[in-house]
Amino acid sequence: MAHGDEPEEGEAYGEGYMAPPAHRLRAGTLLIANTNLFEPTFRRSVIFIVEHNDGGTLGVVLNRPSETAVYNVLPQWAKLAGKPKTMFVGGPVKRDAALCLATLRAGVSIDGVKGLRHVAGRMAMVDLDAEPEDIAPLVEGIRVFAGYSGWTIGQLEGEVERDDWIVLSALPSDVLTDASEDLWAKVLRRQPLPLSLLATHPIDVSRN
């Protein structure tokens, strides 16, 4: 069973939460870890899907800041990095590789712009070999990730069907959300009932 933004009669999120059809799994959407996903790497994680195609799925975890400053790794990009200006852990794959997302300014076009590749809406991938001065006028900010999360063909669909993930729409601000905010709860709170009730699920399950 897959999930989206609107509940549909006859399917459920976990225990009693209604779920819509599967076709919304695509680049630019969010994967929200369900409350039954206890694996430390992904517990209460919010993953932005960068690519979803016949080759599989690639995404980055938006709410796992590291203690490594962007300036210490990519000093030329530090000025554009959103607060906190640290590297984020995008996932368990290729932790020694950097991947960068940007939130575009409203109304800008990046057609023909070297160094930016549109993902969805106002979200774009940034080529870290590009010149930051060329990118700066077009973006509200960037987020740099160490590593990523990846799934082979059909693997993610299976995990969604197993209720490990809830698939929801992303807002441009999600990519740059400050680490001090609970992005997992924030995304759930903006959903319609009954899904928004999951935002009250305690971080420490022993308190439930």
Curated annotation (Swiss-Prot):
Protein name, UniProt field: UPF0301 protein MAB_4928c
Cellular component, GO annotation: cytosol
Similarity annotation: Belongs to the UPF0301 (AlgH) family.
Annotated organism of origin: Mycobacteroides abscessus (strain ATCC 19977 / DSM 44196 / CCUG 20993 / CIP 104536 / JCM 13569 / NCTC 13031 / TMC 1543 / L948)
